[in-house]
Amino acid sequence: MFKLLAAAVFAASLLLPVAGLGGPTAAPPNAYLYIGYPNNNQVLPAGKPFKVWFGLRNMGVAPKDVKYPNTGHHHLLIDVDLPPMDKEIPNDRNHLHFGAGETETMVELPPGKHTLQLLLGDDKHIPTNPPVYSKKITIYVK
């Protein structure tokens, strides 16, 4: 029994260095991410791109693949809920990546009700720990 327990402890210890490499990047507890424009419940004209401005406090913005303390890059979520916080943020038309360190973008959406939310990702597009995300806002394109 002792040999079995010792073997299990040894095997688990071999996994520890690997588990530490892929974990989320730490974020300060007072980090604050927000959408500066458009405003919640704002009506925007259809057929015309509009600016989305990203705001971040108590952290910095760095391009993807740059691992530096207290930095990350923006992901704009359109008409979706937050993804799993322990996995890479999807990259599709509802999860826009700004891996060059952008702090604003132009978006054009079809007429209707839409939601926008920001999520900060680390150098590997994984949400920080604790996750840093904005309030979800609603906009209307008419």
What is each of the regions a protein language model found here?
Residues 7-17:
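Bacterial N-terminal signal peptides
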Residues 23-47:
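Short, compositionally biased P/S/T/A/G/V-rich stretches that sit at domain boundaries
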Residues 48, 110-112:
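A glycine-anchored, Pro-Gly-centered beta-turn/N-cap motif
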Residues 55-66:
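Short amphipathic, basic-aromatic surface patches that mediate peripheral association
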Residues 66-74, 133:
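Short coil-to-beta strand junction motifs in C2/discoidin
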Residues 83-85, 121-129:
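Short acidic/polar inter-strand loop motif in beta-rich domains
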Residues 130-142:
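Short beta-strand elements
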